[in-house]
Amino acid sequence: MLRIVPPKEIQGEVIAPPSKSYTHRGYFLSLLADEKSIVERPLISDDTLATIDAIRAFGADLIEEVVYPPEELRPNYIFARDSGTTARISIIVSSLAKGVSVIDGREQLRRRPMEDGVSSLRMIGVEAIGKRLPVKVFGRGRISAKEVSIVAEKSSQFATGFLILAAKIGLKVEIVKPVSKPYIEMTLKTMEEFGVKYDKAQENERLVIFVDPGVKGTKFKVPGDYSSAANFLVAGALYGKIRVRNLMRDDVQADKEILNILREYGAKVKVKDEYVEVESNERNPLNVDCSNFPDLFPLLAVLAAYAEGKSVIRGRQLRIKESDRIHAMAVNLSRAGIRVRELSDGLEIWGGQPKGFRGKTFNDHRITMALAILALGAKGESIIPETKSIAKSYPNFFEDLMRVIK
């Protein structure tokens, strides 16, 4: 249990942790590379440990930051913990392991949909069973198919899985109704780091990517994480001034969009090569569709709770993340005395002065961190009964938070 009393001042500097999304991609591409790779400064969290376990199960050796890929992937039991990225990429990559692989996870992950990836595996001649975890894949070892189509309106993670598979075998990947497009761009950017060549074209609601085979062993330095840094950037926009280092100015991460949103909110945003700095100023209401950056939704709801007016925050896949994030934030904002109306795809939020509250995290790391940021400016003491969920993506979050509380 964590008790938060609003501090007198919020100001300081933190270093953004390594990116979870890039860490996943770097490890899976290292698994399929032609020789050893170095994944430099990876994020170590529950989700990325699941990916480390997965690539080892497929036959890779990992010694400190060096990944030695196997000559051939071996079929195995993959336990993805609560990591949707680990599970979905493993389902696709296991098609290269000749034999039966089973991909499973914890109860929370077992509730998330897997049928789109399973259906697309069948298109390339790979039998797979399961609409949700556990999923059983009957790997072929060698795949002769030349193209695949994946519906990505619920998640871009299977699209990433097929792009990583394509980097190994060569494949035309058609992504239908892609949601979270920046995550696909992040996958392509990481593939480039591993020497993968590709061409892409946009055709109406389809993104078509022609990927040449060949993943080269490389030294891949994991960039800082805009998703985790967003917690502190939002805190700066609301309460004081915070500087975050280790963020790439030209990154394609989806959650880099937080910088544009904070400018719209009225905050002072300074972007340099060495850091990003955000200082509080105005608190304008927001109207945002976060379908391309769903992990920002809880923090955008926090911004809206303090805004001067009515905000609308929407996103297509918000109900099928680690929790139903729309409902989760509606519950918590209501407990903080903020008027909120739940929509099918988002929230209407009438901003004001949140009061101290007893939060409910729904065992969702993003909700937990957002509630901590919400509590910093609330009128009175707030209680967050569960904080273990942050281990999924940002184990040192509360230690870093203490650096900016005066």
From Swiss-Prot:
It is an enzyme of class 2 (transferase). The keyword Transferase applies. SUPFAM superfamilies: EPT/RTPC-like. GO terms for molecular function: 3-phosphoshikimate 1-carboxyvinyltransferase activity. It is found in: Cytoplasm. GO terms for biological process: amino acid biosynthetic process; aromatic amino acid family biosynthetic process; chorismate biosynthetic process. It holds the Pfam family EPSP_synthase. Coiled coil: none annotated. CDD domains: EPSP_synthase. The active site is at D295. GO terms for cellular component: cytoplasm. Monomer. This is 3-phosphoshikimate 1-carboxyvinyltransferase.
